[in-house]
Amino acid sequence: MDTDLDVPMQDAVTEQLTPTVSEDMDLNNNSSDNNAEEFSVDDLKPGSSGIADHKSSKPLELNNTNINQLDQWIEHLSKCEPLSEDDVARLCKMAVDVLQFEENVKPINVPVTICGDVHGQFHDLLELFKIGGPCPDTNYLFMGDYVDRGYYSVETVSYLVAMKVRYPHRITILRGNHESRQITQVYGFYDECLRKYGSANVWKMFTDLFDYFPITALVDNKIFCLHGGLSPMIETIDQVRELNRIQEVPHEGPMCDLLWSDPDDRGGWGISPRGAGFTFGQDVSEQFNHTNDLSLIARAHQLVMEGYAWSHQQNVVTIFSAPNYCYRCGNQAAIMEVDENHNRQFLQYDPSVRPGEPSVSRKTPDYFL
């Protein structure tokens, strides 16, 4: 299993991956000098976009007007065309009034299809929905990392948020470590918003919205789903329910760990090479599953070449849903279907052909960061 060595921004780590495919848009645009004047300390302050200034006291109730608007946005986005800045503002305000009422541990019923990292690979996201079935016919659970690295983070996160608002009980979007103000400044989403909108306003809206994403989900009280992994400060799922998630991802602590940690072959807790979170061994995952009467921990956060990988004697599964990650890693992607009887099936798929790009077979990566 390969570790995607994202690190907290305070460590001053720059992007480690050099794209080898020719694109009109560079992955990170390499335009920090031009963008420097656009950024200020205020950009890191939660709530600066104003999307949550007038939160509702009850969940959003869809009416015909809302439904028609959402359907138009989804149709527009399905063509890989970004929404206008005004429409992003409207969408994010609606999404706040859905997400703020979801729990830290979102209960999910079976059947459900569980998905890993997407990372701005919009055409591959559409392929995912072809493989797994359209929403709302299929009940989906996404485990975070919708933005950064890929070329279409704006369209990807807009599409998933629009689907969430349109079908709030048929799609769940958890927070990943990349749904963060600090990480998105380093790995592409911030620059993409500047490039496509000419300002940081859309970036502010979405990063404010990320604070409201639930951080874990529990499928039929048996499968614990989250982006990263376990925390030495969390022994029970009830402790996750008590966390204050409406904030920027902290640099340390239990919320940070849930979004950053990784399983490891070594037992116990270890220092993570990422600089945030921990590594945890089979003894830790077995004890957590036993304490909480779980059958499985499902998580994302790491590239796995076949799209999924078991660890810790099948106490943990990693799911990765971005094929040919960063358009060069040569991996397959996968999603995991869980049926009414808790039977699990993995559906693997290769990258979708992007418009204007020739079809190429998967290749072995030269290296991985």
From Swiss-Prot:
Cofactor(s) it depends on: Mn(2+)
Q: Give the UniProt record's GO annotations in the biological process aspect.
A: G1/S transition of mitotic cell cycle; mitotic cell cycle; positive regulation of autophagosome assembly; regulation of TORC1 signaling; regulation of translation; TOR signaling
The UniProt entry, under InterPro entries, shows: Calcineurin-like_PHP_ApaH, Metallo-depent_PP-like, PPA2-like, Ser/Thr-sp_prot-phosphatase
Q: Where is the active site?
A: 178 (proton donor)
Q: Where does Mn(2+) 1 bind?
A: 117, 119, 145
Q: What is its EC number?
A: 3.1.3.16
User: Catalytic activity annotated for this protein?
Assistant: O-phospho-L-seryl-[protein] + H2O = L-seryl-[protein] + phosphate; O-phospho-L-threonyl-[protein] + H2O = L-threonyl-[protein] + phosphate
Disulphide bonds in the chain: none
Q: How does it assemble?
A: Inactivated in a complex with phosphatase methylesterase PPE1 (PP2Ai). Interacts with phosphatase 2A activator RRD2, which can reactivate PP2Ai by dissociating the catalytic subunit from the complex. Forms a ternary complex with RRD2-TAP42.
Name assigned to this protein: Serine/threonine-protein phosphatase PP2A-1 catalytic subunit
Species in which this protein is naturally found: Saccharomyces cerevisiae (strain ATCC 204508 / S288c)
Gene encoding the protein: PPH21
